[in-house]
């Protein structure tokens, strides 16, 4: 009980980050708007989640609704760009974000699509303190925006059921990432509003590996995600210098 109380009292929320994304909430579902990079990135991460989750739980990735028996958490869900496809694949979705505006936008859009997603304006530590548990946790492009990344990672990991999976996507704290993700994407190409990212809050691969182990999980896989300007598409790669995804699991009992 004391551990849950500590989690409830702690906050992963960075007010500046919440204000920044709340101001853009209405644009989540505009593929040509401020979240265009996420719309472009989405097919790659969706395919990765579908394939790895199906393989891990012995499911048929080609099935229409392969995730029907799984409970998912999309933490830092934003406007629901990941939550909606997962719901269509049958997952019982709990989608959380600390921005009330994001949750309102996501809820309205899901209702328009006829999707039953449990959207909540809350935090990882509050969900953990309430004793929530999940088979799969999607921790995508959020850890670099929280106040205490390693505490946030532990809170998320504490909600993972035995044998469960957590997907983590973030940016590496390298000079290359600063050049591509901040100077290039925000200042030169204008793909993202200036100030979207703070390079000092990026997570190195070594920090991620240590954080996953400290949270009681095992790292199954780590892969880079690279952008090809000639095709205007993202794909998995060996290059983890800028964008990368980590796949972690909790041991089965």
Curated annotation (Swiss-Prot):
Q: Name one GO molecular function term.
A: polyprenyldihydroxybenzoate methyltransferase activity
Q: Which UniProt keywords apply?
A: Methyltransferase, S-adenosyl-L-methionine, Transferase, Ubiquinone biosynthesis
Q: Give the EC class as a word.
A: transferase
* Cystine pairs: none
A GO BP term here is: methylation
Reaction catalysed by this enzyme = a 3-demethylubiquinol + S-adenosyl-L-methionine = a ubiquinol + S-adenosyl-L-homocysteine + H(+); a 3-(all-trans-polyprenyl)benzene-1,2-diol + S-adenosyl-L-methionine = a 2-methoxy-6-(all-trans-polyprenyl)phenol + S-adenosyl-L-homocysteine + H(+)
Tell me the protein's name.
Answer: Ubiquinone biosynthesis O-methyltransferase
Native organism? Parvibaculum lavamentivorans (strain DS-1 / DSM 13023 / NCIMB 13966)
């Amino acid at each position: 009980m004391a551990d849950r109380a500590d989690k409830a009292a702690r906050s992963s929320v960075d007010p500046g980050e919440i204000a920044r994304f709340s101001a853009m909430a209405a644009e989540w579902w505009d593929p040509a708007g401020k979240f265009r990079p996420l719309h472009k990135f989405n097919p790659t991460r969706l395919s990765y989640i579908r394939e790895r989750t199906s393989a891990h739980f012995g499911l048929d990735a080609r099935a229409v609704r392969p995730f029907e028996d799984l409970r998912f958490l999309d933490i830092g869900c934003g406007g629901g760009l990941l939550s909606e496809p997962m719901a269509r694949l049958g997952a019982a979705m709990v989608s959380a974000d600390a921005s009330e505006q994001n949750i309102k936008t996501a809820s309205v859009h899901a209702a328009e699509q006829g999707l039953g997603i449990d959207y909540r304006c809350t935090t990882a530590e509050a969900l953990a303190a309430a004793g929530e548990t999940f088979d799969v946790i999607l921790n995508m492009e959020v850890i670099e925006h929280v106040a205490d990344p390693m505490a946030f990672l532990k809170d998320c990991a504490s909600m993972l059921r035995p044998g469960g999976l957590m997907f983590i996507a973030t940016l590496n704290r390298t000079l290359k990432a600063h050049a591509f993700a901040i100077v290039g994407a925000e200042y030169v190409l204008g793909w993202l509003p200036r100030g979207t990212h703070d390079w000092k809050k990026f997570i190195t691969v070594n920090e991620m590996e240590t954080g996953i182990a400290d949270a009681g999980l095992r790292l199954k896989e780590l892969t880079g995600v690279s952008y090809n300007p000639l095709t205007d598409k993202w794909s998995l790669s060996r290059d983890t210098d800028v964008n990368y995804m980590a796949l972690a699991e909790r041991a089965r009992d």
